[in-house]
């Protein structure tokens, strides 16, 4: 085994300095990005999110539901821990159960939100989890319109896409900055 005890060359020293400088700059950018993340105002507020959703499994069983989710805001999003739903029209899909809670809505920017790991679990099978990105409108405090596509991964839903589409409005209104 041979060890090279020669001191580093000027080129090696320069490359080491360059690498350290780049690493420091990347670290600063990461800190700056975290500091400028979207925030919700006001935080610590109980809210409801209400709207009409159309759901189906692989284009079948289309059911229209009126849903209300109940949650609490924090600086970075909303955590929903309860919901109710009523069938407005259509097929046999249940409107009042199946959504796996808690459900987290993350504020991405002043015009976009993400539902984190959305999952629907029913007696016929499970769809999800999947992150669902939706447009956000500060003027109306509304997520959507948009469509969640969740992969079926169990029971009769295995290998099929489950869909939920519509808009949901937060009340009292919040702002994402």
Give the predicted meaning of each segment.
Residues 1-15:
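Short, Lys/Arg-enriched N-terminal segments with co-localized hydrophobic residues
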Residues 13-14, 31-39:
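Sec/Tat signal peptide C-region and signal peptidase I cleavage site
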Residues 18-19:
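Mobile, glycine-rich extracellular loop/lid and propeptide segments
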Residues 23-32:
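Bacterial N-terminal signal peptides
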Residues 35-86, 100, 160-177:
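N-terminal segment immediately downstream of the Sec signal-peptide cleavage site
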Residues 44-50, 110-116, 145-147:
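Short, hydrophobic/aromatic-rich segments at coil-to-beta transitions
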Residues 64-141:
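Predominantly extracellular/secreted and cell-surface proteins with exposed
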Residues 127-177:
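A charged, solvent-exposed segment within the mature domains of Sec-exported extracytoplasmic proteins
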């Amino acid at each position: 085994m041979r060890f090279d005890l020669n001191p580093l060359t000027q080129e090696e020293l320069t490359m080491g300095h360059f690498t350290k400088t780049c690493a420091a700059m990347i670290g600063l950018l990461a800190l700056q990005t975290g500091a400028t993340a979207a925030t919700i105002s006001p935080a610590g507020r109980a809210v409801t999110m209400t709207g009409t959703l159309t759901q189906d499994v692989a284009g079948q069983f289309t059911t229209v539901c009126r849903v209300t989710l109940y949650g609490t805001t924090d600086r970075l999003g909303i955590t929903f821990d309860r919901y109710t739903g009523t069938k407005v029209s259509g097929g046999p899909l249940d409107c009042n159960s199946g959504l796996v809670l808690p459900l987290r809505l993350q504020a991405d920017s002043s015009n976009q939100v993400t539902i984190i790991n959305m999952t629907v679990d029913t007696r016929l099978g499970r769809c999800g989890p999947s992150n669902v990105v939706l447009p956000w409108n500060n003027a109306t405090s509304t997520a959507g319109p948009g469509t969640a596509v969740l992969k079926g991964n169990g029971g009769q839903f295995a290998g099929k896409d489950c869909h939920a589409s519509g808009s949901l409005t937060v009340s009292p209104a919040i702002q994402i900055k």
